[in-house]
């Protein structure tokens, strides 16, 4: 299972949120370029970067920093946050980003998503963020009436190859991932699934790996030492 150390960017710094609440923001490193390099030096093989400013503004804000992070880390990176047009997708992928994550726009602008998938195939991932099983949009500020399983099925039909599923109620809480929802997703669609939110220990990563998932994202647990980079590399290389 691929494990993605997460770097969330706000005002040019690495931060962590609690349940997606921008008012509950904690700065974990003032230098995101150094953080990206540290994860890669520690053995990370793929980074997950979120432009939180971009998610709020609906356009990429931290492009320059993200490019420098990619250069410093020299490992593949996937980026999300505020990507709502094909021109923005083009810009990221043309600048060397390996995969872009389309969030709210997958629900609100299906034509854009379809065009992106047609053009770039596996370089497009969709982020499904849900609260109590219902999809949230606009930087998690609004909750729709769309069930996460229905949206995942819809994405599969469009040709999306990777879904990143975040249970907002677990994000940044260190309470463990929602294994039940991930198992339901795994049964519902036949595409790459990446679990996000709540990972608090090596045991959580092992449990997600045992579900047969393609990947998992680790954030706060890496920053506070609950998970080490050696845990990441060992779980990543173990067949469960």
From Swiss-Prot:
Catalyses: 1-(5-phospho-beta-D-ribosyl)-5-[(5-phospho-beta-D-ribosylamino)methylideneamino]imidazole-4-carboxamide = 5-[(5-phospho-1-deoxy-D-ribulos-1-ylimino)methylamino]-1-(5-phospho-beta-D-ribosyl)imidazole-4-carboxamide
Q: What class of enzyme is it?
A: isomerase
Q: Which UniProt keywords apply?
A: Amino-acid biosynthesis, Cytoplasm, Histidine biosynthesis, Isomerase
Q: What does the record give as its pathway? A: Amino-acid biosynthesis; L-histidine biosynthesis; L-histidine from 5-phospho-alpha-D-ribose 1-diphosphate: step 4/9
| Xref: InterPro entries | Aldolase_TIM (IPR013785), His_biosynth (IPR006062), HisA_bact_arch (IPR006063), Isoase_HisA-like (IPR044524), Isoase_HisA-like_bact (IPR023016), RibuloseP-bd_barrel (IPR011060)
Q: What is its main location?
A: cytoplasm
The entry lists its GO molecular-function terms as: 1-(5-phosphoribosyl)-5-[(5-phosphoribosylamino)methylideneamino]imidazole-4-carboxamide isomerase activity
**Pfam families in the record, alphabetically?**
His_biosynth (PF00977)
Q: Where in the cell is it found?
A: Cytoplasm
Q: Identify the catalytic residues.
A: 8, 129
Q: What is its EC number?
A: 5.3.1.16
For whether the record's keyword set contains Amino-acid biosynthesis, the answer is yes
One biological process term in Gene Ontology: L-tryptophan biosynthetic process
Cellular component (GO) terms are: cytoplasm
Q: Which family does it belong to?
A: Belongs to the HisA/HisF family.
Entry protein name: 1-(5-phosphoribosyl)-5-[(5-phosphoribosylamino)methylideneamino] imidazole-4-carboxamide isomerase
Gene that this sequence comes from? hisA
């Amino acid at each position: 299972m691929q494990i993605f150390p997460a770097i969330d960017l706000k005002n040019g710094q690495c931060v962590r949120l609690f349940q997606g609440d921008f008012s509950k923001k904690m700065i974990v490193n003032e230098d995101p370029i150094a953080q990206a390099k540290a994860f890669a030096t520690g053995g990370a093989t793929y980074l997950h970067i979120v432009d939180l400013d971009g998610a709020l503004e609906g356009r990429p804000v931290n492009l320059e920093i993200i490019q420098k992070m990619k250069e410093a880390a020299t490992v593949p990176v996937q980026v999300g946050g505020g990507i709502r047009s094909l021109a923005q997708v083009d810009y990221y992928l043309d600048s060397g980003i390996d995969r872009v994550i389309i969030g709210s726009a997958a629900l609100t602008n299906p034509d854009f998503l379809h065009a992106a998938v047609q053009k770039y195939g596996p370089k497009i991932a969709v982020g499904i963020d849900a609260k109590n099983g219902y999809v949230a949009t606009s930087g998690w500020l609004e909750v729709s009436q769309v069930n996460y399983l229905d949206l995942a099925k819809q994405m599969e039909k469009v040709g999306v190859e990777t879904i990143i599923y975040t249970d907002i109620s677990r994000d940044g809480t260190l309470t463990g991932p929602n294994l039940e929802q991930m198992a339901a997703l795994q049964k519902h669609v036949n595409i790459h699934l990446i679990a996000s939110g709540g990972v608090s220990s090596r045991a959580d990563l092992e449990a997600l790996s045992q579900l047969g998932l393609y990947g998992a994202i680790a954030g706060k647990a890496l920053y506070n030492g609950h998970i080490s980079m050696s845990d990441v590399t060992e779980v990543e290389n173990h067949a469960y």
